[in-house]
UniProtKB/Swiss-Prot annotation:
Protein name as it appears in the record: ATP synthase subunit beta, chloroplastic
Assembly notes: F-type ATPases have 2 components, CF(1) - the catalytic core - and CF(0) - the membrane proton channel. CF(1) has five subunits: alpha(3), beta(3), gamma(1), delta(1), epsilon(1). CF(0) has four main subunits: a(1), b(1), b'(1) and c(9-12).
Binding residue positions for ATP: 172-179
Subcellular location: Plastid, Chloroplast thylakoid membrane
Top-level lineage group: Eukaryota
Keyword annotations of the record: ATP synthesis, ATP-binding, CF(1), Chloroplast, Hydrogen ion transport, Ion transport, Membrane, Nucleotide-binding, Plastid, Thylakoid, Translocase, Transport
Gene3D superfamilies: 2.40.10.170, Bovine Mitochondrial F1-atpase, Atp Synthase Beta Chain, Chain D, domain 3, P-loop containing nucleotide triphosphate hydrolases
């Protein structure tokens, strides 16, 4: 979708000072502002409050109009803390939605929801800006090619492959490894594909945001010597921000990604961590605006808000945005309205399992719950499809036999079932993999495994060629050759102990 970027320097100096309102009421992050008759701002217009607090410190708060109340009043949601604001303060209507800087100048930098740099590296060239509220590309502009996006992570590439220009969800409860998986994907994609990424930190921990920034500087994804050579732009609206900022920070990140797609005609990666916090912030704002809550206390506009964000993430004939979104699952309940609404938009789902994490199998991706629309013979080829189906069948049979094993033990199984269980346990361990970004914690060097190597490895396990190897040889290795080498080392160690 082509849109001419606006070329103007942002700031209040260029604002029409005539359209002034006054704060009539402040309730937390929500402001009611009275304007002169006939001078009402439009929905989504940015309002700016400038002044000084009671101690004389300067205040500069940007708000977004959400409701027109009548009696020449509007209700707006603040994008930053409202501390120090008082009734009667002047409010300037900017006459336009929030606009953020876009283009090459954003690479290697960290921004807040307003597009202001927060990394203490000086101002950003904001001669080119885009409004954060934009319509999705027209149907005729969409690109419908189907191709696989290789990640180098075995369990993902084999069982739930990602679509280039598609939307992928990482589902998991607290502490099962969503953010680590996202960091690994950024690392692998920057190294293997050299693509540009935009990372939207929506309502997550500030510490994780800082860790990610440091990690990117160490791995060279952000080039400290020459910032312009960096491969990623970061947009943060963390847990401590007001709900307005957390609700809009995803749109800011998406707007920056859209510029790379539409104007630079690039393939972009958009990471959102965490899309649930976008819904949560929308729920808080909805309650503050006095809307009647719907199921489980969520906002009545949940599907609309999610749709307006997700429909902008797509491939056009100019370029593509491949989006990988972490989805926190409240109380591990996938039927909760927030994850359930997200499911409808996704091409692939990577479900993280607490059971696998407890066994120490990382990435803790559930091979049976994770799905992908790309796993079809006409897209991935017969060999890949057959291998993936056999792996799933073996693991499913193992899952069915677990109750019998728990009650009666392995000895009561038939010879065929015992062989299935042995192979399934090897497959389960071979689906684990050492990550580059976790090297500092695990001490094992990270591994990138190509798709052909992955398929070959699982075919060897399924064929029975490796039935004689111990299952621990398959744990936390890269390709199958490393597993056989590890088995030889284990055998030598056990012989030397004897």
């Amino acid at each position: 979708m082509r849109m001419n970027p606006t070329t103007s320097s942002s700031g209040v100096a260029t604002l029409d000072k005539k359209n002034l309102g006054r704060i009539a009421q402040i309730i937390g992050p929500v402001l009611d502002v009275a304007f002169p008759p006939g001078k009402m701002p439009n929905i989504y217009n940015a309002l700016v409050v400038k002044g000084r607090d009671t101690v004389g410190q300067p205040i500069n708060v940007t708000c977004e109009v959400q409701q027109l109340l009548g009696n020449n009043r509007v209700r707006a949601v603040a994008m930053s803390a409202t501390d120090g604001l008082t009734r009667g303060m002047d409010v300037i209507d900017t006459g336009a939605p929030l606009s953020v800087p876009v283009g090459g100048a954003t690479l290697g930098r960290i921004f807040n929801v307003l597009g202001e740099p927060i990394d203490n590296l000086g101002p950003v060239d904001n001669s080119t800006t885009f409004p954060i509220h934009r319509s999705a590309p027209a149907f005729i502009q969409l690109d419908t090619k189907l191709s696989i996006f290789e990640t180098g992570i075995k369990v993902v590439d084999l069982l739930a492959p990602y679509r280039r220009g598609g939307k992928i969800g990482l589902f998991g409860g607290a502490g099962v490894g969503k953010t680590v998986l996202i960091m690994e994907l950024i690392n692998n994609i920057a190294k293997a594909h050299g693509g540009v990424s935009v990372f939207g930190g929506v309502g997550e921990r500030t510490r994780e945001g800082n860790d990610l920034y440091m990690e990117m500087k160490e791995s060279g994804v952000i080039n400290e010597q020459n910032i312009a050579e960096s491969k990623v732009a970061l947009v943060y609206g963390q847990m401590n921000e007001p709900p307005g900022a957390r609700m809009r920070v995803g749109l800011t990140a998406l707007t920056m990604a859209e510029y790379f797609r539409d104007v630079n005609e690039q393939d972009v990666l958009l990471f959102v961590d965490n899309i649930f916090r976008f819904v949560q912030a929308g729920s808080e704002v909805s309650a503050l605006l006095g809307r009647m809550p719907s199921a489980v206390g969520y906002q009545p506009t949940l599907s609309t808000e999610m749709g307006s964000l997700q429909e902008r993430i797509t491939s056009t004939k100019e370029g593509s945005i491949t989006s990988i979104q972490a989805v926190y699952v409240p109380a591990d309940d996938l039927t909760d309205p927030a994850p359930a609404t997200t499911f409808a938009h996704l091409d692939a789902t990577t479900v993280l399992s607490r059971g696998l994490a407890a066994k120490g199998i990382y990435p803790a991706v559930d091979p049976l719950d994770s799905t992908s629309t790309m796993l079809q013979p006409r897209i991935v080829g017969d060999e890949h499809y057959e291998t993936a189906q056999q792996v799933k069948q073996t693991l499913q049979r193992y899952k069915e036999l677990q109750d019998i094993i728990a009650i009666l033990g392995l000895d009561e199984l038939s010879e065929e079932d015992r062989l299935t269980v042995a192979r399934a346990r090897k497959i389960e361990r071979f689906l684990s993999q050492p990550f580059f970004v976790a090297e500092v914690f695990t001490g094992s060097p990270g591994k990138y495994v190509g798709l052909a190597e992955t398929i070959r490895g699982f075919q060897l396990i399924l064929s029975g060629e490796l039935d004689g190897l111990p299952e621990q040889a398959f744990y936390l290795v890269g390709n199958i050759d490393e597993a056989t080498a590890k088995a030889m080392n284990l055998e030598m160690e056990s012989n030397s102990k004897k």
